[in-house]
């Protein structure tokens, strides 16, 4: 399978204070999120000057990917400029016939995979009859470079705290009903499997997995334990240092720089716990190599690169033109409330 271009498909984020509220309205449209909730989340962005780190990180990643291979790379987002519809229309106008789509989410499930498939279908409709064929690359939660980047980040973070620090992985929580209906439990099982792979690569036998950034009505069950509750429990058990690894995120979303670097760090300091946060891949050159490797799997018919571990968890396959890659695993059975301003 040959490609004329690559599309980096991401979530999007504001790049100035005046963009924050319109961005959040895009994210939550049709979900009945109260205005006061939007105001609260807006403050997280305004704390950083109204700028999400994600677009800048993605532009650097695109430059790295263009340096590593010969195909032009287009940039499209779901919720803010540059929109995916505009990117696909530009591809059409530039004569692109087939493009590989690399989404900035490593997982299967509705929020982390199927919504990107829906983005592809919507963008092709907007581009019309001459829209390019769009091939979404497979999820990569068990790719050797994904595991390597997080393992190295844990090692680097561990060097900043005392040697007996407890390792805590985090990923974005979702409603348990949404998790059951996709897979079932494909997202949470993939996250748990990836934590085992990364922990082993980093040399850890004991670790915790917690979930972060939930919202919505308290009566609606979400994946647990919440990382704030987990930290409270660790403090009660006498743990005096933690390394937090946000394995659910491939870049520094607001949920990372606010929920972890700000709120969770303050909680740890108040409890007398030394705190270190492992880096996400962001624009690490290895992340671009990972994307290039996924493209080459399809271009040259290569066997998918995966780290083998006990009790492996299946993932979705590549998909074409917004068609579900594996319907039992990636169905829009529910539209879970957007947890805050991001997505797993």
UniProtKB/Swiss-Prot annotation:
Cell compartments where the protein resides: Cytoplasm
Q: Which residues are [2Fe-2S] cluster-binding?
A: 113, 316, 325, 330
Q: List the catalysed reactions.
A: Fe-coproporphyrin III + 2 H(+) = coproporphyrin III + Fe(2+)
Keywords annotated in UniProt? 2Fe-2S, Cytoplasm, Heme biosynthesis, Iron, Iron-sulfur, Lyase, Metal-binding, Porphyrin biosynthesis
Q: Which residues bind Fe(2+)?
A: 172, 255
Relay the cofactor remark from the entry.
Binds 1 [2Fe-2S] cluster.
Q: Which EC class heads this enzyme's classification?
A: lyase
Q: What is its EC number?
A: 4.99.1.9
Q: Which cofactor does it need?
A: [2Fe-2S] cluster
Q: What processes does the entry annotate via GO biological process terms?
A: heme biosynthetic process
Q: Which domain of life is it from?
A: Bacteria
Belongs to which family? Belongs to the ferrochelatase family.
Quaternary organization: Monomer.
Briefly, what is this protein's role? Involved in coproporphyrin-dependent heme b biosynthesis. Catalyzes the insertion of ferrous iron into coproporphyrin III to form Fe-coproporphyrin III. Has weaker activity with coproporphyrin I, protoporphyrin IX, deuteroporphyrin, 2,4 hydroxyethyl and 2,4 disulfonate.
Q: What else is known?
A: Was identified as a high-confidence drug target.
Protein name per UniProt: Coproporphyrin III ferrochelatase
Q: Which organism is it from?
A: Mycobacterium tuberculosis (strain ATCC 25618 / H37Rv)
The gene is cpfC
């Amino acid at each position: 399978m040959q490609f004329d271009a690559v599309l980096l498909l991401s979530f999007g984020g504001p790049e100035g204070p005046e963009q924050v509220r319109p961005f959040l309205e895009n994210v939550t449209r049709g979900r009945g999120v109260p205005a006061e909730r939007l105001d609260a989340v807006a403050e997280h962005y305004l704390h950083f000057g109204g700028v999400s780190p994600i677009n800048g990180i993605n532009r650097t990643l695109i430059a790295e990917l263009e340096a590593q291979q010969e195909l032009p790379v287009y940039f499209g987002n779901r919720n803010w400029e540059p929109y995916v519809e505009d990117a696909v229309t530009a591809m059409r106008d530039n004569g692109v016939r087939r493009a590989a789509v690399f989404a900035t989410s490593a997982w299967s499930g509705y929020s982390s995979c199927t919504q990107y498939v829906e983005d592809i279908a919507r963008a092709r409709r907007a581009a019309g009859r001459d829209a390019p064929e769009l091939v979404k690359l497979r999820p990569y939660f068990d790719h050797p470079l994904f595991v390597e980047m997080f393992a190295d980040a844990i090692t680097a973070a561990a060097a900043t705290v005392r040697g007996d620090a407890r390792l805590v992985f985090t990923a974005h929580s979702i409603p348990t009903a949404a998790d059951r209906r996709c897979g079932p439990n494909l997202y949470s099982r993939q996250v748990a499997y990836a934590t085992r792979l990364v922990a082993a690569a980093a040399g850890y036998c004991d670790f915790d997995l917690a979930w972060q950034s939930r919202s919505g009505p308290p009566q609606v069950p979400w994946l647990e334990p919440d990382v704030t509750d987990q930290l409270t429990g660790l403090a009660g058990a006498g743990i005096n240092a933690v390394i937090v690894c946000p394995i659910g995120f491939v870049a520094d979303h607001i949920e990372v720089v606010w929920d972890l670097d700000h709120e969770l760090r303050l909680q740890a300091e108040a409890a007398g716990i030394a705190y270190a946060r492992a880096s996400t891949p962001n624009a690490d050159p290895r992340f671009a190599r990972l994307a290039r490797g996924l493209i080459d799997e399809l271009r040259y018919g290569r066997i998918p690169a995966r780290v083998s571990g006990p009790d492996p968890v299946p993932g979705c396959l590549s998909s074409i033109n917004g068609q579900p890659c594996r319907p039992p695993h990636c169905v829009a059975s529910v539209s879970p409330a957007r947890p805050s301003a991001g997505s797993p």
